[in-house]
Amino acid sequence: HSKLASQNDRSGWHLIVLAKNLNGYKNLIKMVSLSWTEGFYGRPRIDKELLEKYHEDLIICSACIGGEIPQHILNGRMDKAEESVLWFKNLFGEDYYLEIQRHETHDPNAAQDVYPHQVTANKAILELARKHNIKVIATNDVHFVNAEDAEAHDRLICLSTGKDLD
């Protein structure tokens, strides 16, 4: 996202950023610090300009369906998805991974639309990976390890979004 986001979009896209070594860790910490001081818009955010400036020794994964590439795919914008994939590949090279997820839930309290979206996104992501010779990783959208931690996670989300716990 650019620093000048629309008034309606404060969320940004999800992206996994990992440090390869101490230098990568320093770059990651620098970006996180700047996201709070310069990129804050409803929440701390890191834009592509910061990624370009501090990209050395970082590993990037395209993230869950909340990521830029899956969102473009789900919105029917394969052209934008491919443009984004190429931007990340050009900047991060072999340290850029396309991510797929597929975890169907039988929990009646969970969002039931996530799995079909993952299936749709995965198909297009695999096509982009083949076309541009990008490695694919299979992950899960894990936010806590133990089921009993779900309530604490819900409370944390409510605190960060300013919503009430149901």
Residue ranges, per PLM feature:
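Phosphodiester-processing cores and adjacent nucleic acid-binding clamps
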Residues: H1-D166
